[in-house]
Amino acid sequence: MNYEGHLKGHRGWVTSLACPQQAGSYIKVVSTSRDGTVISWKANPDRHSVDSDYGLPNHRLEGHTGFVSCVSLAHATDYALTASWDRSIRMWDLRNGQCQRKFLKHTKDVLAVAFSPDDRLIVSAGRDNVIRVWNVAGECMHEFLRDGHEDWVSSICFSPSLEHPIVVSGSWDNTIKVWNVNGGKCERTLKGHSNYVSTVTVSPDGSLCASGGKDGAALLWDLSTGEQLFKINVESPINQIGFSPNRFWMCVATERSLSVYDLESKAVIAELTPDGAKPSECISIAWSADGNTLYSGHKDNLIRVWSISDAE
C-alpha cells in the first residue's frame, strides 16, 4: 500500500473516521476529534503537488462541548451521527454542516454510535454501561438492560443483515455481546479477551465479527454460532479493527503499529509507515467504499491516507 499524504485540520487526537457508502460522494471521509469538532473532507485538486494536503475541510461541525468520540454515516443520505463525552449524540446534515437533532438520555460520556443498515434506527453506548436504541426522530425506544454489560461499552456496530437486525457490542468487562435488536435480547456473550475490549466490527457479509483490546489479541468470531475461529496476537493494545469492504483483509491499529492482515493466511501483508518514519499512534481507521483507500487517524492530530497499488 502506498502513502498518499495527510489531512490537517484538527487540534486534538483524531478519534473516529467514517467514509460515505454512496459511490461518487464528494465527501471523502468524516472525522471526529478530541478538539470537540467534526470535519467532513473533500478532495484537494492540488493534492499531488509538493507539500499540499491530500484533502480540504468541506465543513467543520461545531456544537459538542466535550471530546467527540465516534462518527457513523447514514448509508443512503448525507447525514452523520456523532457521540461525545458531553453525554449527547448529535445528527448532522453534511450538506450544510448544521446540527439537525440532539439525542439526550445517556448519563455519562457516550463512546459509540451507529446507524442501522436501513438508516431507520440508531444504537449508542458509553460509560453508563447501557446500550440504547433510538429512532431518527430522537426518541429512545429500547434500553438493553437485561444481561447487559457490567462496565463501559466502548464499541458498537450493526450487522449488515436487514432480515435479522443484530447489534454487536464490546466492553471494558472483557466481553462481546450479540443482541437481537427487535427484542432487545442478548443472544450470546463472547468470552475470549483477558482485558478490556476497545473495538468490535462485523464483516461486510455479516458472517464474522472481529474484536480487539488491551490484551493485544485480535479475535475472529463466527457471528451465527459465537465460535472463536482464530486469534492473532499483535503484542500491543489494539485501538481499532476494520474489515476491507471487498477483500479478505483486516486492518489493525495498535499502540505500536498499523498493519493489514490477509485473513486466509493470517499473515501481515502491509505495515503502514509514511516514508519509513515511525508515525504517531493510530487510534482510528476507515476504508473507502471501494476498498481502494484507507484513512488512519492519529494522536498527532493528522489523518493519513493510504492507497492500494494495482498489484495488490
Swiss-Prot record:
N-terminal signal peptide: none
GO molecular function, one term: translation regulator activity
Renumbered ranges of WD repeats: 9-42, 63-93, 105-135, 148-180, 192-222, 233-262, 279-307
Pfam families from the UniProt entry: WD40
Keywords linked to the UniProt accession: Repeat, Ribonucleoprotein, Ribosomal protein, WD repeat
InterPro entries: G-protein_beta_WD-40_rep, RACK1-like, WD40/YVTN_repeat-like_dom_sf, WD40_repeat_CS, WD40_repeat_dom_sf, WD40_rpt
PANTHER family xrefs: RECEPTOR FOR ACTIVATED PROTEIN KINASE C RACK1 (PTHR19868)
Record-stated family: Belongs to the WD repeat G protein beta family. Ribosomal protein RACK1 subfamily.
Protein name according to UniProt: Small ribosomal subunit protein RACK1
Species: Leishmania major
UniProt lineage: Eukaryota, Discoba, Euglenozoa, Kinetoplastea, Metakinetoplastina
